[in-house]
């Protein structure tokens, strides 16, 4: 019997209806390559294999779970014992659909890694904490990761999933989100862009002129006395380009 490890933040989704809904949101067609993050006991893996995909890669860090997944025995399935928060998705193909019930303690890192691999991931469907889903949409306590993701993807809220649909039940509500690639602004150096965003989100209560030269804010058409949460997606990009060009 497979044991769940608390350190991995594992909560297994056991609702057949929700599992099917997640798979449906991927719009799997014949010839598609799908990457599942954190296959666990294979509940979602088995549902995905009911679709006409060409190849299913499952990235799973827990070695005990890896052996369990391999026992499914489908020739289209390949299990990879790696950390999905660092794994180069694009090494698996040029166009991938990524999916997963993400462990809560590393969900943000996996989503960040998905953005770094955006050139080969036009679509991703993830289960995350409801609070994380709302933040990513920019509807609640927007942070740097929300802006980072929304620069390259539309974030769609699919459904809320209550704790009773998991084993063991988490203490919080969960949600399914769908990321659809829609690069709104051309950013070449993603690590530099992340550095800019994390810096601007530090000391959120400070007005922007305390963090960024006032002349750059005015050139971007931004009120120097505004705070970071008042900026639009376009504001962030304009400011980033100006700072990049000025060498600040």
Swiss-Prot record:
SUPFAM superfamilies: S-adenosyl-L-methionine-dependent methyltransferases (SSF53335). It catalyses: adenosine(1518)/adenosine(1519) in 16S rRNA + 4 S-adenosyl-L-methionine = N(6)-dimethyladenosine(1518)/N(6)-dimethyladenosine(1519) in 16S rRNA + 4 S-adenosyl-L-homocysteine + 4 H(+). GO terms for cellular component: cytosol. InterPro entries: KsgA/Erm, rRNA_Ade_diMease-like_C, rRNA_Ade_Mease_Trfase_CS, rRNA_Ade_methylase_Trfase_N, rRNA_adenine_dimethylase, SAM-dependent_MTases_sf. One of its GO terms (molecular function) is rRNA (adenine-N6,N6-)-dimethyltransferase activity. Its EC number is 2.1.1.182. S-adenosyl-L-methionine binds at residues 11, 13, 38, 60, 83, 101. The record marks 105, 198, 202, 204 as: Interaction with RNA. It is found in: Cytoplasm. Keywords: Cytoplasm, Methyltransferase, RNA-binding, rRNA processing, S-adenosyl-L-methionine, Transferase. Its main location: cytoplasm. GO terms for biological process: rRNA methylation. It comes from the Bacteria. Specifically dimethylates two adjacent adenosines (A1518 and A1519) in the loop of a conserved hairpin near the 3'-end of 16S rRNA in the 30S particle. May play a critical role in biogenesis of 30S subunits. Belongs to the class I-like SAM-binding methyltransferase superfamily. rRNA adenine N(6)-methyltransferase family. RsmA subfamily. This is Ribosomal RNA small subunit methyltransferase A. The lineage of its organism: Bacteria, Pseudomonadati, Aquificota, Aquificia, Aquificales. The gene is rsmA.
């Amino acid at each position: 019997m497979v044991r769940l490890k608390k350190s991995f933040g594992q909560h297994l989704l056991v609702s057949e209806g929700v599992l099917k809904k997640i798979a449906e949101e991927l719009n799997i067609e014949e010839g598609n390559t799908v990457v599942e993050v954190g296959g666990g006991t294979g509940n979602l893996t088995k549902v995905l294999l009911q679709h006409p995909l060409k190849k299913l890669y499952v990235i799973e860090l827990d070695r005990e779970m890896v052996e369990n997944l391999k026992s499914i025995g489908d020739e289209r399935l390949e299990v990879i014992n790696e950390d999905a928060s660092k794994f180069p998705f694009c090494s698996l193909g040029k166009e991938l659909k990524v999916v997963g019930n993400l462990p809560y303690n590393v969900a943000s890192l996996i989503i960040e890694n998905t953005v770094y691999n955006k050139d080969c991931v036009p679509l991703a469907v993830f289960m995350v904490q409801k609070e994380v889903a709302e933040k990513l949409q920019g509807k609640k306590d927007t942070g740097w990761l929300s802006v980072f993701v929304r620069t390259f993807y539309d974030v769609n809220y699919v459904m809320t999933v209550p704790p009773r649909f998991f084993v063991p039940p988490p203490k919080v509500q969960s949600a399914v989100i769908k990321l659809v690639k829609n690069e709104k602004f051309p950013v070449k150096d993603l690590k530099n862009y992340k550095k800019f965003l994390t810096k601007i989100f530090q000391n959120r209560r400070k007005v922007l002129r305390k963090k960024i030269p006032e002349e750059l804010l005015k050139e971007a058409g931004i009120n120097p006395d505004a705070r970071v949460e008042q900026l639009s997606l376009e504001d962030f990009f304009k400011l980033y380009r100006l700072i990049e060009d000025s060498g600040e």
